[in-house]
């Protein structure tokens, strides 16, 4: 992280130990020279200003360090007795609790500093220990700098004036230190700042000396090279205290938030430093940096000297324990400090004996700090905070000199950590938790004071992240260390690794070996040095160190106890912290984490930060008092197990001292000079006490460390085992996934093989199909070549499409049928399986997230789930969908890829799901293909039907392949949407492009020919698609059974109805069967419908339902049936069925198609034979509807009704239903071309109406609502809207009206909710989908039953009206054809591009919408009522409740869109008005609020603005893909597009919008994206309170927060302002820019565009100016 220069007052343990009265010199702070040498100036330093031993130097570097009035006098002045110092420390803690907490990071150097902190606090506050920025360091930087003042002020007990005086003293000291450090800079560079939290540091933690807090907050977290030098300063300032400072920086980075050392040991000087430090640390950051550099040199030199002395002396004195504790403390802290501990470790613990290790350590710590700057900061500071705290008690006893030296001598740290790691781990864990919590609480509290909470939260999140990462890295490292421990035990590891693992494990091994060897050496040296030095410097410092070490050891024990209590791993974490600090020093990130004793201990600090934040952050003085008491208690507890009596006595003494200090802190604020003297005395006493205590503690700590090490080793082993287990699990999971994938692939391959064999057999039976298969193979090869030449053939694709379309148009129906069958079989091979669960494929496909990611995924998911594009979009795995979107124009070339890839994806699923379905399908296909063949032969055009059966067999093969090759079907759906959807898509394409309409004609002729077989294959494809799509819904088996039953029934019905209505094999035509069904439907239409044109017209009629075509051609079958059956009875049932089927085609294409076919047959039978309608429709409908309701209903309600019907309710559905129905009647009356034209025109009209919706914000209802239908299936399924839609389609006008009016409000609400939920409720989608699906299954079952009853009623009505309306429809369609054909031409141009991507969505959507429109129109109007009836049906539907708003939209679209739709006939108006009146009455009845209800009973959704649901027509989702809608959504920039193209686009969009007022606002913003953004914002805002989800009455917090966020965003946020705040622009500047823009547009744009440009340019320029 970036180096944060923190003003950290680092107290030298040396100075503290030397004299409490005099402010310790930098060198004394850097490390205690031996007691006398602490007072004795280093001769080398006096001569050269440089000392090789740096911080380890036993002698005072600089005659003036003490002489600057603070060092010796401040330290050793008996006026500042240790007790007074402690009391002052406590008082300062209490007074400066916030300050020390702020400065704990800064001043974690030590309470020595606290004692001398008044003088040195300034220095150390000025000492900018530049820590690498970690989230914590950054947090603490801000915190301790700003909150230092705040904390200084925060600890108001600490007088600000006193703080100023202390600050001034500190400044003086810092000046001296800066001079000294400048002199010793070179040596400091050599000397590693061993930020081992020495007992002083622990004391400083306990008595949060400002220096400790500063250092704890800033130095380590900021630890960078300067942090190391600052750490060196800390070490210098308190060589022992600097380890403590390091630990206290770690723990006080934690504890600065904890605000107060937990140990009662008095850190009085710290408050002074804190008080002054906060203010002057900033001033002296530069000085402190310089001082840090010099101190780093001195610290290194002194560290060497001290290490030598410590090695010599502490070897005799409590060697292992102290050193372990300091070393581990330092290890935690120093490795936290960065490389210091690591470098110390990297030489190996043996380096401890050598002065060079300190240099290396010093070098490494800076390096590591910089290397792992943020880890070092945040980690090392937490580690320092955490790991040192535990180790501080021994280190405290050693004295901060020892700790600094130990931190300098990393091996000592290793030994001490090994010894103290048990204790240290506990204490560190507890301390570091507390200190980290304290530091974080204080630093965070200070941050909170200084930082916005967002910054704090970010930092905390960063810290938490880092902690987690560090925990993870620590766990890894710990496991490594456990492994390396064996290696490191031998010290055979990489120096760093050996250090880190030595730190982690060598502390154990070294405890075993080095602990006795090196700890005896180094701890004895450092302790003898530290204690002798402390004694030489001053027994006060030693006493202080001891008392602080006691308090810190208490803190450590307390923290160890806490950390044990909190985190049993904390000792391990502590060891990790030590190891990890080393390891983390090795890996800078691991530095952070391991320094954070462990990731878990770090997080546990976060887990329990409130304990510490609570204590320190909230009440630093309280935390100091009570936190220290807690620490004492915990330490006593922790230490009592090790040396309960000693620690209890010491802790009691420390508690008494700290309590005295805490009591005196309030008193001593004005007597800080006396306190300093008393502190010096107390420090000397405490030093002596602490030396003894440290020895005892060191022994106990060594025991504890060993225990902790063992525990840590066990934990690490367990973690390793767990990691290995997790890895094994992951491997097993991966293997299982791979196996499953392989199985899926094998299944797909087997299915492909089986399908190929079937196709071969069928090809043997049918040479035509063989030729078609050859053509398919050729086209596959071509498509493969196209895939190879994909980019080259991108250009040729459109040409090929056009050629194919033209060829298909030009070719004879059979030629077209052969080619299309082959192509469609390609498509079928790919498409039924795409049908299968494109949803699942998406979900399972790796590209699903990428492809469907974001809005595309949501929208496409919506569209795919809503728009029944089972073959295409759903089955298209996201990759395929991506491919489809990318290359739908390229799809012909990419078809083989998609087919193969989607076959891979889908066939995997299909092999699983469809393996049985394929068998069933094969059986049903064979049976029904034969049935269909016989029926088709029996039916009209036996030759055609044979061709159809042949093609149906081919298509059955293809569909088996398609179902097995869902992606092939997708690709072929894409190609087949180019080819097969030249059947389906070209039908839908007719909606967009007449060429495809022609193709659709020929395609549907093909379909008619191949109806029977394709019916079977379609049904089976629908079965598979049900299984794949339906499988999402549980009743897959039921669906299969029902589908098979329906297949049988369809075959029977086909036989009977083919006998009756020869063309009525429609129910079985699901996708491809629609060809045959269309043929039969054409014939039936020809035979049945008097006005029906010859079968070519009928064949054209099935194409008119592109929705059905895409669906499974179910709607084309339904349309064929509707057309054949005069589109009244049949279209009602067929539309109901196809509505069910169309949505269900996604889910239940088979049932939907079968049911739609059955109902189509029923309706046809009804039309042809009303008694049959009553009998067969009643029988078939009721059982089939019930079945459908159960299986289809569930799936439908899941996807089909909710998505399909909700889609279909959109304008496209109503328009298309009207259009398709009228198209059917027109086709019946006028002709297939007219129908196709009408379809294209109607679809264009639908687009227009939907674009009007889009402009109105209805794109939400049609587009967004349709998205939300798919997305928030729940809202519609769960919402009565889906039920309404079901009811409106199936229910009688009354039941529909009532249900729908109820549902309308819910539907409107939910549509708006879903619009909003499109964004807001996408999270709800999954849950909502499943929940409403279940609800809607039942509802849809019931409603479909009601529908069929109502359908029968409506069919009678509609039959009467169909005759009159069909004539009007012919007129209307002719008009609309003429009107829309021009639009379709432009739409074709725009959509030709969008077609590839959107057509397929549109085709499926249009199929959905057409099928749903047909269903609605047939159900609602019960008759295909011309284009007027489309509006009428839209209105009737909306008036009937489902589509009231939709129909209103259709009305507005039809009427307000420049009368794109012809006026509604009187019959239609009567029905619409009747339905309107009924539904409005129902709505009013529902709207009428009952008498005051219980709040729970109130439907508060009534309070929501009941936006009249603009008729959501079935193809609402298709609106998204109309060129206008797409351009609206995508937006078009006049500048980029040019005024000419812009004018065209605007024209197209305006045409499609059908609302001139909306067209004016089409491109309000010149930046296209802004238009859609503004639209979406409007929709979002409008629907905020509407789309509340399935449980509208219960507003969940998530929804509430989402609403609030959106409200803030939309109304107050910058989003709207960025787009709309044109007033921000200077008017003159705007005028000039407008002039320039006009000139540019005049140059670039034709004259006619200039006006638009001027109009648009003014608004858009304003916005551009705002935006740009």
Swiss-Prot record:
Residues 1-38, 56-157, 190-1112, 1125-1466 are annotated as: Disordered. Its main location: nucleus. GO terms for biological process: mRNA processing; regulation of stem cell population maintenance; RNA splicing. Residues 645-789, 1300-1366 form a coiled coil. Residues 204-213, 323-346, 370-382, 584-593, 1084-1100, 1125-1153 have a biased composition (Low complexity). Keywords: Coiled coil, Developmental protein, Isopeptide bond, Metal-binding, mRNA processing, mRNA splicing, Nucleus, Phosphoprotein, Repeat, Ubl conjugation, Zinc, Zinc-finger. It comes from Homo sapiens (Human). InterPro entries: m6A_RNA_Methylation_Regulator, Znf_CCCH, Znf_CCCH_sf. Residues 76-136, 283-315, 394-434, 442-575, 594-640, 649-821, 881-957, 970-981, 1073-1083, 1163-1188, 1213-1223, 1231-1286, 1294-1379, 1386-1421, 1429-1438 have a biased composition (Basic and acidic residues). It is found in: Nucleus speckle; Nucleus, Nucleoplasm. There is a cross-link at residues 179, 194 (Glycyl lysine isopeptide (Lys-Gly) (interchain with G-Cter in SUMO2)). Belongs to the ZC3H13 family. The modification Phosphoserine is found at residues 64, 77, 198, 207, 209, 211, 238, 242, 265, 316, 318, 325, 328, 370, 372, 381, 643, 831, 833, 837, 845, 848, 853, 873, 875, 877, 943, 986, 993, 1010, 1014, 1017, 1191, 1194, 1208, 1210, 1230, 1364, 1366, 1382, 1386, 1406, 1409, 1438, 1465. GO terms for cellular component: nuclear speck; nucleoplasm; nucleus; RNA N6-methyladenosine methyltransferase complex. This is Zinc finger CCCH domain-containing protein 13. A zinc finger (C3H1-type) spans 36-64. Associated component of the WMM complex, a complex that mediates N6-methyladenosine (m6A) methylation of RNAs, a modification that plays a role in the efficiency of mRNA splicing and RNA processing. Acts as a key regulator of m6A methylation by promoting m6A methylation of mRNAs at the 3'-UTR. Controls embryonic stem cells (ESCs) pluripotency via its role in m6A methylation. In the WMM complex, anchors component of the MACOM subcomplex in the nucleus. Also required for bridging WTAP to the RNA-binding component RBM15 (RBM15 or RBM15B). The modification Phosphothreonine is found at residues 237, 263, 354, 364, 882, 1033, 1170. Pfam families: zf-CCCH (PF00642). The keyword Phosphoprotein applies. It comes from the Eukaryota. Residues 214-224, 958-969, 996-1010 have a biased composition (Basic residues).
């Amino acid at each position: 992280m970036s180096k944060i220069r923190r003003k950290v007052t680092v107290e030298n343990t040396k100075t503290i130990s030397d004299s409490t009265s005099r402010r310790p010199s930098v060198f004394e702070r850097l490390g205690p020279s031996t007691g006398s040498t602490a007072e004795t100036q280093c001769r080398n330093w006096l001569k050269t200003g440089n000392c090789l031993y740096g911080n380890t130097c036993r002698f005072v570097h600089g005659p003036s360090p003490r002489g600057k009035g603070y060092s010796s006098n401040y330290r050793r002045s008996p006026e500042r007795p240790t007790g007074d110092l402690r009391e002052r420390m406590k008082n300062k803690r209490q007074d400066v609790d916030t300050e020390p907490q702020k400065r704990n990071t800064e001043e974690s150097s030590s309470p020595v500093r606290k004692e001398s902190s008044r003088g040195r606090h300034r220095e150390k506050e000025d000492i900018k220990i530049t820590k690498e920025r970690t989230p914590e360091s950054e947090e603490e930087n801000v915190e301790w700098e700003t909150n230092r003042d705040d904390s200084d002020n925060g600890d108001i007990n600490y007088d600000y004036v006193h703080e100023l005086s202390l600050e001034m003293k500190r400044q003086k000291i810092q000046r001296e230190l800066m001079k000294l450090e400048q002199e010793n800079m070179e040596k400091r560079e050599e000397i590693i700042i061993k930020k081992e939290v020495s007992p002083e540091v622990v004391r400083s933690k306990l008595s949060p000396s400002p220096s400790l807090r500063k250092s704890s907050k800033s130095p380590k977290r900021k630890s960078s090279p300067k942090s190391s030098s600052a750490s060196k300063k800390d070490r210098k300032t308190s060589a022992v205290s600097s380890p403590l400072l390091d630990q206290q920086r770690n723990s006080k980075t934690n504890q600065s938030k904890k605000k107060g050392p937990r140990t009662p040991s008095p850190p009085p000087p710290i408050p002074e430093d804190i008080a002054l430090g906060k203010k002057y640390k900033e001033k002296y950051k530069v000085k402190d940096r310089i001082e840090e550099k010099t101190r780093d040199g001195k610290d290194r030199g002194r560290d060497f000297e001290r290490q030598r002395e410590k090695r010599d002396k502490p070897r005799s004195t409590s060697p292992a324990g102290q050193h372990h504790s300091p070393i581990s403390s330092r290890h935690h802290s120093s490795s936290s400090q960065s490389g210091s501990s690591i470098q110390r470790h990297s030489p190996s613990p043996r380096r401890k004996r050598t002065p060079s290790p300190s240099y290396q350590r010093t070098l490494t710590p800076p390096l590591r700090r910089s290397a792992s700057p943020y880890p070092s900061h945040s980690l090392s500071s937490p580690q320092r905070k955490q790991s040192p705290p535990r180790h501080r008690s021994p280190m405290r006893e050693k004295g901060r000199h020892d700790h600094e030296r130990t931190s300098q001598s990393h091996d000592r740290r290793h030994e001490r950590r090994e010894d103290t790691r048990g204790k240290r781990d506990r204490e560190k864990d507890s301390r570091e938790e507390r200190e980290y919590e304290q530091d974080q609480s204080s630093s965070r509290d200070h941050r909170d004071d200084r930082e916005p909470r967002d910054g704090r939260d970010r930092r905390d999140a960063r810290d938490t992240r880092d902690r987690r990462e560090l925990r993870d890295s620590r766990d890894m490292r710990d496991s490594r260390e456990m492994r390396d421990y064996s290696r490191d035990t031998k010290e055979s590891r990489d120096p760093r690794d050996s250090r880190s693992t030595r730190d982690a494990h060598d502390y154990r091994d070294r405890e075993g070996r080095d602990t006795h060897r090196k700890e005896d050496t180094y701890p004895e040296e450092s302790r003898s040095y530290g204690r002798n030095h402390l004694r030489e410097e001053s027994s006060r410092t030693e006493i202080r160190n001891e008392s602080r070490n006691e308090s810190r050891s208490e803190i450590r024990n307390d923290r160890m106890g806490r950390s044990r209590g909190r985190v049993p791993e904390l000792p391990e974490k502590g060891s990790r912290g030590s190891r990890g600090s080393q390891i983390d020093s090795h890996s800078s990130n691991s530095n952070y984490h391991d320094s954070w004793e462990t990731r878990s201990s770090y997080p546990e600090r976060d887990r329990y930060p409130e304990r510490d934040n609570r204590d320190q952050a909230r009440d630093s003085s309280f935390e100091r008092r009570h936190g220290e008491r807690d620490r004492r208690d915990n330490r006593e507890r922790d230490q009592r197990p090790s040396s309960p009596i000693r620690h209890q006595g010491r802790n009691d003494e420390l508690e008494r001292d700290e309590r005295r200090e805490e009591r005196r802190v309030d008193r001593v604020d004005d007597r800080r000079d006396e306190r300093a003297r008393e502190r010096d005395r107390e420090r000397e006493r405490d030093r002596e006490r602490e030396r003894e205590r440290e020895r005892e503690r060191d022994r106990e700590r060594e025991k504890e460390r060993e225990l902790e090490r063992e525990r840590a080793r066990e934990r690490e082993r367990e973690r390793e085992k767990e990691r290995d287990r997790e890895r094994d699990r992951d491997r097993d999971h991966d293997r299982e996934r791979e196996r499953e994938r392989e199985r899926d692939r094998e299944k797909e391959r087997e299915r492909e093989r089986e399908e190929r064999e079937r196709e071969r057999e069928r090809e043997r039976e049918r040479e035509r199909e063989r030729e078609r298969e050859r053509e398919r193979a050729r086209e596959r090869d071509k498509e493969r070549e196209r895939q190879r030449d994909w980019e080259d053939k991108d250009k040729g694709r459109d040409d090929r499409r056009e050629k194919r379309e033209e060829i298909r148009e030009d070719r004879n129906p059979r030629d077209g049928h052969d080619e299309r069958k082959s192509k469609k079989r390609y498509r079928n091979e790919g498409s039924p399986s795409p049908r299968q669960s494109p949803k699942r494929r998406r979900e399972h496909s790796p590209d699903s997230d990428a492809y469907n990611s974001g809005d595309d995924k949501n929208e496409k998911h919506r569209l795919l789930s809503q728009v029944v594009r089972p073959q295409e979009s759903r089955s298209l795995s996201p990759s395929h969908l991506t491919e489809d979107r990318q290359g739908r124009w390229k799809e012909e070339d990419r078809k083989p890829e998609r087919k193969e890839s989607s076959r891979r994806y889908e066939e995997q699923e299909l092999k699983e799901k469809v393996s049985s379905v394929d068998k069933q399908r094969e059986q049903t296909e064979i049976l029904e293909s034969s049935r269909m063949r016989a029926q088709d032969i029996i039916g009209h055009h036996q030759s055609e039907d044979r061709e159809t059966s042949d093609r149906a067999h081919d298509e059955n093969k293809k569909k088996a392949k398609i179902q097995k090759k869902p992606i092939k079907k997708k690709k072929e759906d894409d190609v087949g949407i180019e080819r097969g959807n030249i059947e389906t898509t070209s039908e839908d394409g007719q909606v967009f492009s007449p060429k495809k309409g022609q193709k659709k004609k020929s395609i549907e002729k093909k379909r008619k020919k191949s109806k029977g077989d394709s019916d079977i294959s379609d049904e089976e494809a629908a079965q598979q698609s049900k299984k794949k799509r339906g499988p999402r819904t549980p009743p897959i088996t039921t669906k299969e059974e029902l589908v098979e039953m329906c297949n049988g029934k369809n075959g029977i019905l086909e036989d009977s109805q083919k006998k009756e209505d020869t063309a009525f094999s429609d129910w079985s035509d699901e996708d491809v069967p629609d060809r045959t069904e269309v043929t039969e439907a054409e014939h039936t239409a020809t035979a049945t419908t008097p006005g029906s044109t010859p079968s070519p017209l009928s064949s054209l009629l099935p194409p008119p339902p592109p929705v059905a075509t895409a669906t499974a051609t179910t709607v084309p079958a339904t349309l064929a049936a509707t057309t054949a059956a005069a589109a009244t009875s049949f279209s009602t049932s067929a539309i109901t069925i196809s509505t069910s089927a169309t949505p269900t085609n996604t889910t239940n294409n088979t049932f939907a198609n079968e049911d739609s076919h059955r109902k189509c047959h029923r309706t046809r039978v009804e039309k042809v034979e009303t008694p049959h309608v009553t009998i067969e429709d009643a029988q078939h409908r009721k059982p089939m509807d019930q079945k459908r309701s159960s299986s289809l209903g569930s799936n439908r309600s899941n996807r089909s009704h909710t998505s399909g019907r909700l889609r279909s309710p959109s304008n496209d559905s109503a328009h298309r239903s009207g259009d398709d129905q009228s198209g059917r009647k027109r086709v019946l009356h006028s002709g297939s071309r007219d129908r196709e034209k009408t379809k294209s025109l109607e679809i264009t009209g639908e687009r227009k109406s939907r674009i009007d919706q889009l402009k109105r914000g209805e794109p939400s209802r049609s587009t967004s609502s349709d998205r939300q239908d798919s997305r928030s299936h729940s809202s519609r399924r769960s919402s009565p809207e889906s039920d309404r839609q079901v009811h409106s389609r199936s229910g009688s006008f009354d039941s529909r009206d009532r249900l729908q009016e109820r549902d309308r409000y819910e539907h409107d609400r939910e549509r708006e909710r879903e619009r909003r939920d499109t964004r807001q409720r996408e999270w709800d989608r999954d849950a909502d989908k499943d929940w409403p699906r279940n609800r809607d299954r039942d509802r849809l079952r019931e409603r479909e039953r009601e529908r069929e009853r109502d359908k029968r009623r409506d069919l009678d009505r509609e039959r009467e009206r169909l005759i009159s309306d069909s004539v009007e429809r012919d007129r209307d369609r002719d008009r609309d054809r003429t009107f829309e054909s021009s639009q379709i031409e432009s739409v074709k141009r725009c959509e030709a591009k969008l077609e590839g991507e959107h057509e397929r969505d549109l085709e499926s959507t249009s199929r959905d919408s057409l099928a749903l429109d047909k269903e609605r129109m047939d159900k609602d109007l019960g008759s295909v009522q011309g284009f007027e009836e489309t509006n009428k049906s839209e209105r009737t539907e909306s008036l009937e409740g489902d589509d009231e708003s939709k129909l209103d939209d259709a009305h507005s679209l039809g009427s307000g869109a420049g009368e794109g739709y012809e006026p509604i006939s009187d019959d239609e108006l009567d029905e619409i008005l009747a339905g309107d009146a009924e539904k409005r009455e129902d709505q009013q009845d529902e709207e009428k609020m009952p008498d005051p209800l219980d709040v729970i009973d109130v439907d508060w959704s009534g309070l929501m603005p009941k936006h009249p649901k603009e008729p959501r027509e079935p193809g609402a989702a298709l609106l998204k893909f109309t060129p206008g809608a797409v351009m609206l959504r995508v937006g078009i920039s006049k500048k980029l597009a040019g005024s000419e193209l812009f004018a065209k686009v605007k024209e197209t969009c305006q045409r499609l919008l059908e609302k001139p007022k909306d067209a004016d606002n089409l491109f309000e913003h010149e930046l296209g994206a802004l238009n859609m953004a503004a639209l979406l914002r409007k929709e979002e805002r409008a629907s905020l309170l509407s789309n509340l989800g399935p449980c509208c009455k219960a507003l969940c917090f998530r929804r509430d927060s989402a609403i609030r966020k959106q409200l803030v965003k939309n109304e107050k946020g910058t989003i709207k302002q960025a787009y709309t705040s044109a007033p921000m622009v200077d008017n003159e500047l705007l005028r000039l820019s407008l002039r320039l823009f006009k000139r540019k547009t005049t140059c670039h744009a034709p004259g006619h565009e200039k006006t638009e440009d001027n109009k648009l340019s003014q608004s858009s320029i304003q916005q551009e100016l705002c935006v740009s």
